[in-house]
Amino acid sequence: MTDPVTLDGEGTIGEFDEKRAENAVRELLIAVGEDPDREGLRETPGRVARAYREIFAGLWQKPEDVLTTTFDIGHDEMVLVKDIEVLSSCEHHLVPFVGVAHVGYIPSTDGKITGLSKLARLVDVYARRPQVQERLTTQVADSLMEILEPRGVIVVVECEHMCMSMRGVRKPGAKTITSAVRGQLRDPATRNEAMSLIMAR
């Protein structure tokens, strides 16, 4: 499975240091020529630090923690959850990218499935961290394959990146689409079935 972003070899990262984050935001405001002590900005460093704790909460979560509930019901056909909201942050510019994810899988031979909300939570685990869309897509697919052991997985993510909309080429509305396909869903007929379900409105 693609390893999450880590700072050591144990698959974990450091604790969130709110005071250090607050000081860093204050320094950034000074660096861009602002006065962090003026009325409108006086509380901004603290607000941003607390917001980052929430926005990057996925750094302190593991995919297996959200896929703990499974059911053996003998279902052997595709399960697909569409239009899962994606709210993430580009690790290159620390600005948002937003959109939707479609996550589908063919259960294992014993029919083991997970709760539908768990697929949305899995997307959040990987979205709520400094991220790139390509890695996010792969991590969701690989986590499902490793933890649920399904016969196949498909993940399609479609997002607008503020680093393209607000700066650089400045093309609001441009969408990036990434996909990851594993197992039996690599079969053209099965993949086409999944894509037709994803594209149906």
Swiss-Prot record:
GO terms for cellular component: cytoplasm. The keyword Zinc applies. InterPro entries: GTP-CH-I_C/QueF (IPR043133), GTP-CH-I_N (IPR043134), GTP_CycHdrlase_I (IPR001474), GTP_CycHdrlase_I_CS (IPR018234), GTP_CycHdrlase_I_dom (IPR020602). It comes from the Bacteria. GO terms for molecular function: GTP binding; GTP cyclohydrolase I activity; zinc ion binding. One of its GO terms (biological process) is tetrahydrobiopterin biosynthetic process. It is an enzyme of class 3 (hydrolase). Keywords: GTP-binding, Hydrolase, Metal-binding, Nucleotide-binding, One-carbon metabolism, Zinc. Its EC number is 3.5.4.16. Pathway: Cofactor biosynthesis; 7,8-dihydroneopterin triphosphate biosynthesis; 7,8-dihydroneopterin triphosphate from GTP: step 1/1. Zn(2+) binds at C90, H93, C163. SUPFAM superfamilies: Tetrahydrobiopterin biosynthesis enzymes-like (SSF55620). It catalyses: GTP + H2O = 7,8-dihydroneopterin 3'-triphosphate + formate + H(+). HAMAP family: FolE. NCBIfam families: folE (TIGR00063), PRK09347.1-2 (NF006825), PRK09347.1-3 (NF006826). Belongs to the GTP cyclohydrolase I family. Toroid-shaped homodecamer, composed of two pentamers of five dimers. This is GTP cyclohydrolase 1. It comes from Streptomyces avermitilis (strain ATCC 31267 / DSM 46492 / JCM 5070 / NBRC 14893 / NCIMB 12804 / NRRL 8165 / MA-4680).
